[in-house]
Amino acid sequence: MVRIPTHRRPTHPGQMLKEEFLQPMGITQRQLADAIGVPYRQINEIVNGRRGITPSTALRLAKYLQVSPDFWLNLQIRLDLFDIKQKESEQIEKILPSPTTVITSEGGS
């Protein structure tokens, strides 16, 4: 089982895109942008960590690079959750758990 480190910031999807796909495949950012039908600036901002992966971008990258869209979205959500935990940790710590848990089931009689 692969353990995901929780003590350091997760890898930005753009870094993964650059190091694990673009560089080994010999593809430029512009070539990728043209191939998936997005502006060059969008890919450049993702690669440089200034923009996240949207569901639309995940679908496009997945199709072109032959990986699951979930691969890209999971990278992004891990990063987003880590960042928001760091930013809002004090406020989140103040939240008390609900005294009861509500369990619902669908399709019951």
Task: Kindly label every feature range from the protein language model.
Residues 2-27:
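A short, Lys/Arg-rich alpha-helix, primarily the initiator
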Residues 71-109:
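Short, charged recognition helix plus adjacent turn
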Residues 50-63:
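Short, basic-rich loop-to-helix N-cap that marks the start of a DNA-contacting helix
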Residues 22, 33, 62:
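The alpha-helix within a helix-turn-helix
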Residues 37, 48, 77:
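Residue-level detection of the helix-turn-helix DNA-binding "recognition helix"
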Residues 27-45:
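Short alpha-helical DNA-recognition segment
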Residues 1-2, 91:
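General nucleic-acid-binding
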